[in-house]
Structure formats: structure tokens, C-alpha cells
Swiss-Prot record:
Function, as annotated: Might take part in the signal recognition particle (SRP) pathway. This is inferred from the conservation of its genetic proximity to ftsY/ffh. May be a regulatory protein.
Family stated for the protein in its record: Belongs to the UPF0122 family.
TM helices/strands, residue ranges: none
Pfam family, one: UPF0122
Name the UniProt record assigns to this protein: UPF0122 protein Teth39_1278
InterPro entries associated with the record: RNA_pol_sigma_r3/r4-like (IPR013324), UPF0122 (IPR007394), UPF0122_fam_protein (IPR054831), WH-like_DNA-bd_sf (IPR036388)
Length: 117
């Protein structure tokens, strides 16, 4: 899977509810269920060009929502920071010998895992 495909599905996770019903249906068939444009066209009884146009409008809408709201970018930044914190905790676990400090570190690690399963 390429990065554009994954990014588009991530945008859909955040903003899919903002698409029209038809855009959502075609997007899901294409991206999530791996149907071709021709297969979608046959199943929905619309032209292949109509499927293509609807899919492109859905993609443009998702990109527009991200440009204006930035939720995916913010989510990715948070996940990256959580990963850095986890790595730091692992280093501290390896070096720290004080049981009280280790207990606190374990509590912090559990809370981080709840944020980033």
C-alpha cells in the first residue's frame, strides 16, 4: 500500500462523516473494500466517470477538511511525541534502580499506553 492510499484512509477516519452519503459509499467501496471503479459502476448502476468524479470530489473534500482543521496532522504529531516519551521511559527503566521511581515510571507508562494502544 502506498502512502497516499494510507493517508487518504486516515483522512476518512477523521472526516468521513462530513462527506455526503454517496461520497462515503463510493469511497468505502474503493478504499476500504478494494473495488475497482468499474465494479463500483456496475454495482451502483452509474457510469464509471460518475464514480471517478464522485471519488475525486470525496478526496478533495477530505483534503480540504484537513487543510482547514488539521486534525490528522495534530494526531500524527501527538503519536510521534508519545513514541518519543515511550522510548525515554524504556531508557529510564533500564537504568533506574530505585523501586519508588520505577513504580512511578510504570504508572506513567500505563497511562501512555491507554492514550496510544
Amino acid at each position: 500500500m502506498d502512502d497516499d492510499f494510507l493517508f487518504m484512509t486516515l483522512l476518512y477516519d477523521f472526516y468521513g462523516a462530513l462527506l455526503t452519503d454517496k461520497q462515503r459509499e463510493i469511497f468505502e467501496m474503493y478504499y476500504l473494500n478494494d473495488y475497482s471503479l468499474g465494479e463500483i459502476s456496475e454495482l451502483l448502476d452509474i457510469s464509471r466517470q460518475g464514480v471517478y468524479d464522485t471519488l475525486k470530489r470525496a478526496e478533495s473534500s477530505l483534503e480540504f477538511f484537513e487543510e482547514k482543521l488539521g486534525l490528522v496532522k495534530r494526531h500524527q504529531e501527538i503519536m510521534n511525541k508519545l513514541d518519543k516519551i515511550k522510548k525515554g521511559i524504556e531508557i529510564i527503566r533500564e537504568r533506574e534502580r530505585d523501586p519508588e521511581i520505577l513504580k512511578i515510571i510504570e504508572e506513567i507508562a500505563r497511562e501512555i499506553e491507554e492514550l496510544n494502544p
